[in-house]
Amino acid sequence: MTRILDNDLIGDEGSVERTLRPQYLREYIGQDRVKDQLMIFIEAAKRREESLDHVLLFGPPGLGKTTMAFVIANELGVHLKQTSGPAIEKAGDLVAILNDLEPGDVLFIDEIHRMPMAVEEILYSAMEDFYIDIMIGAGDTSRSVHLELPPFTLIGATTRAGMLSNPLRARFGITGHMEYYQTADLTEIVERTADIFDMEIKHEAAYELARRSRGTPRIANRLLKRVRDYAQIMGDGMITTQITDKALTMLDVDQEGLDYVDQKILRTMIEVYQGGPVGLGTLSVNIAEERDTVEDMYEPYLIQKGFIMRTRTGRVVTEKAYQHLGYPYEKTIKT
């Protein structure tokens, strides 16, 4: 069953996000540190009439990495060509993409950490010196062909920056860490989305929805659609704080933005492992989830909210988690 709080795209959300996508940095809400840096770097590159240095955007899913890539291209006034790591299966696939670039273009590779190593190695010379050497033919008739490339900007996006090889990571001149959004920024995003889709929402309701959206715009916009449905059927269409709370409670999204899977993780750690420490692999088996899913989708928010700590011997539940779930806190828990 799909989680309402899943960070990844669900259904037609890709087209919805394109509708909501800001075009320029001044329209982009949140991520101020990344925006401020990019504003300087982009303006400097434009004044020198050079391509922007290659950019690596990393952080949890749903925080606007793809949107930021499009905004960068718009700010530069150039075209953006989009692909993803899993879509580039062979070296020839990447060569075809690179050979199609025009001077100054932006090449956006989502999930760049999932590129095969043979493909990644072609990027090294392309990023550093704007050329590639490829082998044509086979056996005794094979020969090396040198292809010059126009200056371009590669923007890579990843949720797993640690999985990038050192040679690839070193070739990005600009890195942007996309962080979970502040509630005030998410409130503004919710109100902007409501305005675009002609929804009526009280400011206090937008704040409540934002507060329970795990710091993620994608989740906030998804919850807004479900709260709107609830308001239309169970109310008069106006999204109020009371309507928002009832709708989110119905969706099993609690006051801290946790759903049943998050609570299952915490309850399992408390009831089965006495609060920990417990290894991630062991915990994943117990709750019947993939290890990578727990590490990428659930754990970051639980750590950010202070419900779980990472220690040398495993994950440990915090006193805050005990209190939130109504368990007596054991002072002897090992950390």
Swiss-Prot record:
EC number, UniProt record: 3.6.4.-
Gene3D superfamilies, per database record: 1.10.8.60, P-loop containing nucleotide triphosphate hydrolases, Winged helix-like DNA-binding domain superfamily/Winged helix DNA-binding domain
Protein name, as recorded: Holliday junction branch migration complex subunit RuvB
Protein source organism: Streptococcus equi subsp. zooepidemicus (strain H70)
Molecular function GO terms recorded: ATP binding; ATP hydrolysis activity; four-way junction DNA binding; four-way junction helicase activity
Binding residues annotated for ATP, in chain numbering: L20, R21, G62, K65, T66, T67, E128, D129, F130, R171, Y181, R218
Family (UniProt): Belongs to the RuvB family.
Gene: ruvB
Region feature (Small ATPAse domain (RuvB-S)): 182-252
GO cellular component, one term: cytoplasm
